Amino acid sequence: AKVAVGNGADYDPWATKAAQPTKATLVTAAETAGIKEGDNPHVWFSAKVRSNTADAITAAYQKADPSHKDDYAKLNKEWHAKEDQLESKIKETSAKTEGLPYAATESVAWYLADDLKMTDATPKGYAQASANESEPTPADIKDFQDTLKAGFIKMFVFNSQEANSTTDQIT
């Protein structure tokens, strides 16, 4: 391969290791937007990451295969036109969702909610435990349950791929 694409933010360190012995240019999505190791790794939900990564992939292919430079530029332009439609819908929706509180059992949708200008109302203790991949305390779980029962949360994000006995107590 001449170009390899990874997530970054310590989500897929194996990808970096696999690309190192090759001559492939590694494009790491997180790095294109300045997202560092330890930050939220669910970067593909970020408009900035998608756009920056598309441009970085295009540049990598243009460098690896300069005879098709114009073709890659055309494909990038076509992709951006579609992405712009999505971004327009997100911007339109954000006018309605700005400031609305949401809560999440884990941070998978954080970047999307941020683009929608929503407010993360996930109880801090629970959010910190989830981010550190540790168990929340019984008090954290109760705080989350109470937050949901209070009725002010407008969107609840549950990642079924991360379901466990703790999330069962909340959902």
Where are these regions (language model features)?
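Extracytoplasmic metal-acquisition and chelation regions
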Residues: A1-T171
